[in-house]
Structure formats: C-alpha cells, structure tokens
C-alpha cells in the first residue's frame, strides 16, 4: 500500500476545478454577449 498519496487529493481538486470553470466560463460569455447586444440596440 504505497500508492495512498496520489489518488486521494488529486481527483477531488480536479473535479472541483472543472465544475467551477464549466459553470463560470459560459455564464460570463453569455452575460457579456447579452450586455453588448443591449448596448448596441440602444
């Protein structure tokens, strides 16, 4: 049982990072697109 250091803290951190970015990136993109559209229409 020497392989107890790596598979404990690695997947959780990666999953959390992926979840946050998967939710944040499209949201920011969508908000920016809507804002620019409203500014152009006005």
UniProtKB/Swiss-Prot annotation:
Pfam families: Cytochrom_B559. SUPFAM superfamilies: Cytochrome b559 subunits (SSF161045). Heme binds at residue 21. The keyword Ribosomal protein does not apply. The chain crosses the membrane at residues 17-33. With its partner (PsbE) binds heme. PSII binds additional chlorophylls, carotenoids and specific lipids. Its main location: plastid. GO terms for biological process: photosynthetic electron transport chain. It is a single-pass membrane protein. One of its GO terms (molecular function) is electron transfer activity. This is Cytochrome b559 subunit beta. It comes from Emiliania huxleyi. The lineage of its organism: Eukaryota, Haptista, Haptophyta, Prymnesiophyceae, Isochrysidales.
């Amino acid at each position: 049982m020497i392989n107890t250091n790596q598979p404990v803290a690695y997947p959780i951190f990666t999953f959390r990072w992926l979840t946050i970015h998967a939710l944040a990136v499209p949201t920011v993109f969508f908000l920016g697109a809507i804002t620019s559209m409203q500014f152009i229409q006005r």
